[in-house]
Amino acid sequence: MNILKHFPSYVGPSKIRTLVIPIGHWTRKEFNNAVQKLSEFNEIHLSDVTPIDSPIFTPQGFPHGKLFFDFLTIDHDDALELFLYDFEPFRKTFVIIGLVNDYSDPLTNLNFMKEKYPTLISPNLVYASSTPTKELEQTIDTMENVFASSPDMQKNIETIMCDIARNFLTALNSYYSSYKHVTLRSPGAIGGNAVLKTTLIRQNSYTSSSSSTPMSAVQSSVSSSSKAGSVTTASKRLSSFEMTTNSLKRSASLKLATTLSTSENRSQQKSLGRQMKILGNFQLLAGRYVDALNSFVDAITTLYKVRDYLWLGSALDGISICFLLLSYLGLSYQIPQIVSLICPVEKLNFESSSTGISPVDSNSKATASTTASSTPRNSISIAAMQSPRNSIMSLSAPALNIDVENINLPLLIKCISDKVLYYYDLSLMHNSEYAPQVVYCEFLLKTLTFMTSCYKSSEFSKDVLDNIVKNQHRALSDIPNSPMFPRFEVYFYSNKLFELQLKEMQVEAQIKIYSTMAEVYRLLGYKRKQLFVLRLLMVALLATPNKIAWHPDYRTLIDTIIELLNINESEAKINVDDPSQSTWLILQKKILQLCIKVSRKINDFEYVAKFSSILITKYTHLLNQSEQDALFKEYIQPSITNESITSYWDPFILREVVINRILDSDPTSNEIPLESDVSSLESLENRQKTQDINPQEVFNPFKRVQPTSFVSNNSTKVPILVFLVGDKAEFTCRVQNPFKFDFTINDIQLDEEISEFCEIDRKAVSYSGPYNVKAESIRSITLPLIIKKPTYKKIYEISCLKISILKLPLQKFDIINDSRRSNPVEEEAEYSKCIYGKLKIKILPEQPQLELLSTSKMTRNSWMMLDGTKTDFHITVRNKSLSCAINHIKIIPMNNIEQMLKPDYWKKMPPDDLYIMEKQLDWLSKSCVRIIKLPTVIKPNETITFDLELDNTAVPFNFTGFDLLIEYGMSATDESCIYLKKLSIPYEVTLRRTIEVPSMDIIPLNELFSSQVENVDWIEYVMSKIRAESNLHSRDFILLLLDFRNSWIDGIKLNVQFEDFTSNEYHVEASHTSRIIVPIKKIDYKKYNFENTPIPRIYPGRQFIQSGLNEEQTIEMRQKFWCREHIISKLKCNWKLTTDQSVTGSVDFNKFIEKFDHKMVYTIYPGRLFYGVQLLLDEPKVKVGEIINLKIITEPTSTCRRKQNSTVNFLDIVIFDSKTSKILPRSNRRILYNGSLTKPISTTKVSEINLEIIPIEKGRYEFSVCISKSNNQDGIIQFDSENVILSVI
């Protein structure tokens, strides 16, 4: 029997207590299954039981009856109820059944049971052996109380139970005979102070109102359907009860005066009444319900006369049980008159056609009809039973007996129960004849369970009776609209139990009371009331010093409390603005403390550990210092010792993890290499053949090789920690202790996955541990980290650590960076309460290390150079590694000009300036610094030397130095990637200026020179060209005037070249300037169409913004640009020092020659003019009066065709006096001409003009032309610089 699941049945006194014990070799599961099989036949029909030789208990006396067996596996303590056996004999355990699964001797087993349980009157054995021996079978056949079944308890169980029932009836007959000649005393008279008297906490108002609910109210409540009707009924109950009670008192006084003349007669009547009451109890056990009803009626009649209230109440209880059992059997009966007197009954009115009505169904559909006949309310036909015997007729006429079909039976039972309590209350005034508190309480309990069973239905049906008799109880899914007993009435009735001093009762009795009330509250849906009662039950269990025989299902009690409190699901978050929530959390805390104490008392360390963890985890903020200390020392530590707690309860202990490299003093040894795929390097080299610099940005050597795995990813905030095998690293973790007691950390380890590659130094942990973490503090623990093995490309995450706390096994704890604030919008279960941290770690193999030993000629990597010179250096480096070779090496120079430029420098520059700048940058990146004889492999600990050539011929004046970036590394073992490192060597270069070109000019050449000056280099060059080419004239040349300044401290010799012209060597003293003239042919505009040639781009792919220049401005920019490029690309100058001719250099004219202006472009590039003009004379020298022809050829250029809308322009011939440079008038006496000096010319084709001239005065004359849009010289579009000179002698 599970005392924690006690739910007494109202008809419990009719059930035979039967103890079932195991004999042999049973397991708990097998024995429980066997008892369960036996329990399936707990109801035995008397008609199936063999008759016995007893007129009182023979089954033949009432074949409709049944025997109810209540199977127990735990026996009652006889000492607790010994004094109650004379008053309520049904409390005794009568039958014992030994289940035997071996081949032991039956007689031995019977003797064992009689010795161990001597008070049990009917011992029986049931053999469940598989194959009993023949001798055993013969023994079983010869013994009446030994039976044989199968191992699965399926064979002959019903027959066996019928035989056990017969044995019980036989034993009961003998047992009852001992009562016949015994004076029956009340429990208080037998036990004295050992029997606890019922004690009420406050004055019981029960006797004045609710104890005698009249039957008029019982019957009228059937038809009540409104609240107003209920109030009226209540008033009727009170007034009817008062009138009935007064009449009963007067009637009883008259009868007592005539019947009780002496005290001896009174004693005899009391003894007789008690004997009849005991007989009724035994007849209930024997299934003789009609006889029991008669016995109880006789007992009530007698006891009522002598005012034996205790036994009278018990007899009334027996009558109500008889009513229910007869209704359960479906038999009709009548309510005795004595019941009508004590609990006045009014008949219900039905239609006259009612015949053969079942008492069950008659009470299932009550009606408010007041007609003289009733409508049948069932279809069950029950044989009519004989009325109770005539002893009841002595007080009243038979006409006062009421058929059960005419009353509301549930309310009658409730009315009788109230009357029983009324008599029990009256008995409390006696010093020995009082109701023991256990009797009082158990009667309240079974009445409460009866009302609860009726509450679950709106009609008194067969199902309700089954629930009452078979003690079936389960929670309702749907509450009926009109239950027989409203829920509030059942609840108020349960409060009567709190009017008693329950704590003085035996602990077993308290457990029964509290467990029953808890189940009632569960069925009624009062969860908090259920929780309250279960807490009282726990307190009662905890307070008793006695050893309690705990049922294996005791955990259900604790689990129910935890479930009602919603502890497992709820989070203990306190809201200071909600006092009710705080109170509820405090209640949860106290219940948990209680559960821990109870679990500890019964040595259930698993539950102690479970609830201790919940309490310390979720309710820390509600526990003070002493509570936390006691919880830790008394429960948590012992649970850890006995291994009930195997893991630390706080998952948020680990707050931060940091891993740092311990750096060396040499910064180059601390460098982490980049990891790059071999394929990416090969494709990069192919791309560099066509493009060495990213066109979008200035040159950046570290964008040439992108690492494949170790790349800073802006999308993730977790950086990758990269280490090298053999690195010294330091591991630091921060742990928190939010509790008010100290704890120790015994071990810290990394996760298994990463421990293969790196691990915390175990020796350091053993040496410095354990680590004590003070209460309510955070401690940092720092330990060495050993880097063992490379992970290569794979990246591992450290999101947790394995920590051993309080000597518990290693346990994983996530890294908690911070707590996340609650989001009122986001309430999903997936919303995490914490911000978890993690470290990404990658371990590369051991790497080579390159160091610079020396650079020749330099002191501290600094050097002074003359502008325009070149020099060589020898650089010596060494591989410091003793095990790793360098099999990839690349040197990338980077000067300060490239470093200073912004990435978007090109966006606001015009195309011509951009070309000049990027051409210079391109030269700087390709030609300024060159590496010679670079090795491909450097072995471990090998020293090598390579050459570096520094060219300063074209560097700008703001060049101050460069960095030599040595990119080196080693291939992976599988050659899938290369690990790259860099060594940056800075060099400072100081430039000293040598030859500068401060100014430059361009002038036309219009006449030839005499032979006397042909020794000049440039004149000699022009004259030789004219002689060699007949169509070449002096006007086809221009003169480039260059000023060279020597800014150095020594003299310099230099020469200039332009195409095939080479000047003489000029000596320029220090701080002096010399002009050198360079003859240059004019640019043939027919061959070089500059206006249609765009300015080139060094780095194609630029997305230029519109410059804002119109077409003419663009053409003008192109012409200026290409004229400058034409000159600079062919102009060269070499020099050497006069003091040391081994020091040579060159001049980069890009640094000195600015953009050309319009005059320079007009002079060097005729395509800029509207017309190409040629002036030709037959002879350059004539005599006075000699006729000469002047031929002028004009050819319109593309400029003319693009800009001119008209088809004709006008050409004016202009004559100058070469000596005075004055223009001669059109009409003069020095030169005569035939025709007009103004001639029309075409804008689309070549025009040829001939003019005959007769000089009449000696002199030197220049002929030139002026082209205008009209014949009056307005709108001049070109005044040609071309002229021809005529000498007249």
Swiss-Prot record:
GO terms for biological process: early endosome to Golgi transport; intra-Golgi vesicle-mediated transport; retrograde transport, endosome to Golgi. This is Trafficking protein particle complex II-specific subunit 120. Belongs to the TRS120 family. GO terms for cellular component: cytosol; early endosome; trans-Golgi network; TRAPPII protein complex. Coiled coil: none annotated. Keywords: Golgi apparatus, Phosphoprotein, Transport. Specific subunit of the TRAPP II complex, a highly conserved vesicle tethering complex that functions in the late Golgi as a guanine nucleotide exchanger (GEF) for the Golgi YPT1 GTPase. TRS120 plays a role in the YPT GEF activity of TRAPP II in concert with the two other TRAPP II-specific subunits TRS65 and TRS130. Its main location: Golgi. InterPro entries: TRAPP_II_complex_Trs120.
